[in-house]
From Swiss-Prot:
Annotated source species: Macaca fascicularis
Subcellular location: Endoplasmic reticulum membrane; Microsome membrane
Top-level taxon of the source organism: Eukaryota
EC number(s) on file: 1.14.14.1
Gene3D superfamilies per the UniProt record, alphabetical: Cytochrome P450
Taxonomic placement: Eukaryota, Metazoa, Chordata, Craniata, Vertebrata
Gene name of this polypeptide: CYP2D17
Record protein name field: Cytochrome P450 2D17
Amino acid sequence: MELDALVPLAVTVAIFLLLVDLMHRRQRWAARYPPGPLPLPGLGNLLHVDFKNTPYCFDQLRRRFGNVFSLQLAWTPVVVLNGLAAVREALVTCGEDTADRPPVPINQVLGFGPRSQGVFLARYGPAWREQRRFSVSTLRNLGLGKKSLEQWVTEEAACLCAAFTDQAGRPFRPNSLLDKAVSNVIASLTYGRRFEYDDPRFLRLFDLTHEALKEESGFLREVLNAIPLLLRIPGLAGKVLRSQKAFLTQLDELLTEHRMTWDPAQPPRDLTEAFLAEMEKAKGNPESSFNEENLRMVVADLFSAGMVTTSTTLAWGLLLMILHPDVQRRVQQEIDDVIGQVRRPEMGDQARMPYTTAVIHEVQRFGDIVPLGVTHMTSRDIELQGFLIPKGTTLFTNLSSVLKDEAVWEKPFRFHPEHFLDAQGHFVKPEAFLPFSAGRRACLGEPLARMELFLFFTCLLQRFSFSVPAGQPRPSHHGVFAFLVTPSPYELCAVPR
């Protein structure tokens, strides 16, 4: 009898869930909603998406449904934008209406809240504007675009070259050393100090950063975001975000140490001290985003994004130099002609080095390290490429489809520096070069990244010739996706010139 009594309840629950599912699907029935694969009840298209290789999956769906297609991830409506026209229309033409970020329920476990969202994942509004303005102005005050910061980078490049010299021409993987060098530039900006390359906490921070990136692209994470009800299962979210929580704990320790040396009476030496000074001004203002919780989020954003993206691009650069020794020799010849082999490279040299500049840009295009950018969300109903996209829709901007658009690039799937040179050998930058995204949410660290890429790359090519180790097979030029696209593991030999 008890079992019989449960049957009506089960049927009622099933009907309720079906109605909820139908409510979330109703926009797909609109006349001009983008096409897409048929979603399953409850799960939507979660099983249609390969989260281990999302860029490839989206490319296959683009070929089937066109440059603007839709998905339903559980009950979350998603539209994927492909190609330069669709991406630019969304991010630039409709920039005000697509500048928001979708809520990420699982991030509440990390301390995200209305006034503690950092910069990159913050919702579009007063708190984001406040932190974006603060970050840009503080980086400028600390020397971005000036000789002072350029000197920090060139000194760190000298330390990196010394570490490469210590390898004595033996085969080694360069990734860890590149991580350390780039991280020290970020550490100088955020903590006012650099770390020795063998510092145990420094090494631990790298490990946690890379593990956290793997967590970002996990299937279970996407399920928890799509079905927030599952977050109520005790301990599940903490397990999924174990490395990200440990990363934030490590940053907290560094911030606590740094506060002990802060003198409010002195001008800020770094971003952390500038933030602490703003916190003092904002005391008693509950609406301010300058608070303890947001300090760790802002520093975490700058440290993780600023370190991993640039060091990964440099890793791609060295890989492509050993795969294309003719390009490497031509870069070195330009370095010798413009800079020589004695003095350190300077940003002022870049204007006289069109080929090296073209190579660096082609490394960014070919490496395509952030293929899907960061998700956006519509803040009102918009029309895009002839389709109607409702308010609250999550947008994926497929930057990979722009950087490797067959209609724009002569050889989209090959490493070809001439993409960025005109017939006279002058540097040119096509409109489809969007590795930093575009619009209101374009990467705020772009000027710093450009400086680091030029100075680190030219310093390394000035001092060393790179080659595939004798007896080893030619490394793969295919990347590995885990939110970022990193080169497949490889070794090289760095021989002093």
